[in-house]
Swiss-Prot record:
Organism: Halalkalibacterium halodurans (strain ATCC BAA-125 / DSM 18197 / FERM 7344 / JCM 9153 / C-125)
UniProt xrefs under Pfam families: MMR_HSR1 (PF01926), MnmE_helical (PF12631), TrmE_N (PF10396)
Molecular function terms, GO-annotated: GTP binding; GTPase activity; metal ion binding
Tree of life domain: Bacteria
Amino acids binding GTP: 230-235, 249-255, 274-277
Cofactor(s) it depends on: K(+)
Function (record text): Exhibits a very high intrinsic GTPase hydrolysis rate. Involved in the addition of a carboxymethylaminomethyl (cmnm) group at the wobble position (U34) of certain tRNAs, forming tRNA-cmnm(5)s(2)U34.
Record's subcellular location: Cytoplasm
Protein name as annotated: tRNA modification GTPase MnmE
Cofactor binding mode and count: Binds 1 potassium ion per subunit.
Length: 458
């Protein structure tokens, strides 16, 4: 497949030691040679070699920058095209001047994700691996990065391909049965079809069992801190983040809006939201914050309900318990450094079996227990780091669920003695749906949409 030559800055913009301008395409080496000056032309440099030289404007002979240039020839590159990486001095000016010179001499500015898109279109990676690259870039914890890295390496692709192969072999047997009915192989084929379908359904179930944990690792666990004003919600946020992100005072209603922060809790990424204290108020600004808090609460996957150890349970506290009925929650009784007035027995009754943790945030007590409770609530046996293949992408999860339904339709048809060619339709449908995960059968508009999520230069 032939493409034009593209270029982009592949390092983060801003001050730094090194900035890299990446080129990819059939003319990448020749184009770079137009602006490079070194001991010998880049076209004479062996593949996978880095050389020293200068980037020079050929029109004026002005030296733009002192550089190291990596020469990487197809097909042993990420895009399976010729690739040039110009290592410039970091900073906005030097890297942009080199990029502009390259663009002026024939390269096209790459679209977001276009390097990875070419790797996909040229068969270097499949679609699930490409999506793993996005997850790797966006990973918020080491565990999330490890899950993404396994996807980039093809762990999920291998699993999906093996399931598709099992279905394909089954379809092939069915077609032989249909084309050569004189061999009377229908009973054998139906038995085989049932066994294969049950095997594929079981393997899909195994993948879907990792979906909740995988999605949390990929997207973060939507966690909302709620409670009456001045019970220590903002102090809790600051303690978990290990920074002063929220204003902490003794004045009720200090937090008037929703504050959101990513937090790494024992390998679990939390999208932690500190809400305005939920109470009736005449303050217009605070009232808006309270309404936003109620909206955020509806979408939360985990609630951290904070109570005051030094105050009796109020009607507002009991109303909050009612508001989170049936939701995953941890109850935090804060301010154990003051005299106890709260009825902990009643708190545990209202918690209805959910964890109750006592803390004194000002004395840094109870935070370890809280973090352990959060991690165990969603990763009861810990976060697997071995051979587990996590499914973390919403698109993959939806396709696996659809493929499972198609397989179940086939099994139901077999039990009802439906003609074998009708059963084949469901099996083929499952095969196609699994193919969409790795990009074997997917619409071009979806491909464009997926790669548009990438940053420039990747």
């Amino acid at each position: 497949m032939e493409f034009d030559t593209i270029a982009a800055i592949s390092t983060a913009l801003g001050e730094g030691a090194i900035g890299i301008v990446r080129l990819s395409g059939d003319e990448a080496v020749q184009l770079a040679d137009r602006v490079y000056r070194g001991k010998k032309p880049l076209q004479e440099v062996p593949s996978h070699t880095i050389v020293y030289g200068h980037i020079v404007d050929p029109k004026t002979d002005e030296i733009i920058d002192e550089v190291m240039v990596s020469v990487l020839r197809a097909p042993r590159t990420f895009t399976r095209e010729d690739v040039i990486e110009i290592n410039c001095h970091g900073g906005l000016v030097s890297v942009n001047r080199v990029l502009q010179l390259v663009l002026n001499h024939g390269a096209r500015l790459a679209e977001p994700g276009e390097f990875t898109k070419r790797a996909f279109l040229n068969g270097r990676i499949d679609l699930s691996q490409a999506e793993g690259v996005i997850d790797l870039i966006r990973a918020k914890t080491d565990r999330a990065m490890n899950v993404a890295l396994k996807q980039v390496e093809g762990r999920l692709s291998t699993k999906i391909s093996s399931l598709r192969q099992a279905l394909l072999e089954t379809v092939a047997h069915v077609e032989v049965n249909i084309d050569y009915p004189e061999y009377d192989a229908e009973t054998m084929t139906l038995d085989m079809l049932k066994d294969r379908a049950q095997f594929v359904r079981k393997e899909i179930d195994k993948l879907l069992m990792t979906a909740q944990q995988g999605k949390i690792l990929r997207e973060g666990l939507s966690t909302v801190i709620i409670g009456r004003p001045n019970v220590g919600k903002s102090s809790l946020l600051n303690s978990l983040v290990h920074e002063n992100k929220a204003i902490v005072t003794d004045i009720p209603g200090t937090t008037r809006d929703v504050i959101e922060e990513y937090v790494n809790v024992r390998g679990v990424p939390l999208r932690l939201v500190d809400t305005a204290g939920i109470r009736e108020t005449e303050d217009i600004v605070e009232r808006i914050g309270v309404e936003r808090s109620r909206e955020v609460l509806k979408e939360a996957e985990l609630i951290l309900l904070v109570l005051n150890f030094g105050e009796e349970l109020s009607k507002e506290d009991e109303a909050l318990f009612e508001a989170i009925s049936g939701m995953e929650a941890i109850v935090i009784v804060n301010k154990t450094d003051v005299e106890q007035k709260i009825d902990l027995t009643r708190v545990r009754e209202l918690a209805a079996g959910r964890p109750v943790i006592t803390t004194s945030i000002v004395q840094d007590q109870g935070i370890d227990e809280l973090e352990a409770a959060i991690a165990s609530l969603f990763f009861e046996s810990g976060i697997e780091s071995g051979d587990v293949t996590y499914v973390s992408n919403s698109r993959h999860i939806a396709l696996l669920e659809q493929a499972k339904r198609a397989v179940e339709d086939a099994l139901e048809a077999i039990e009802m003695d439906v003609p074998i060619d009708m059963v084949q339709i469901d099996i083929t449908r499952a095969w196609e749906l699994l193919g969409e995960i790795i990009g074997d059968s997917v619409h071009e508009s979806l491909i464009d949409q997926l790669f548009s999520q990438f940053c420039l230069g990747k």
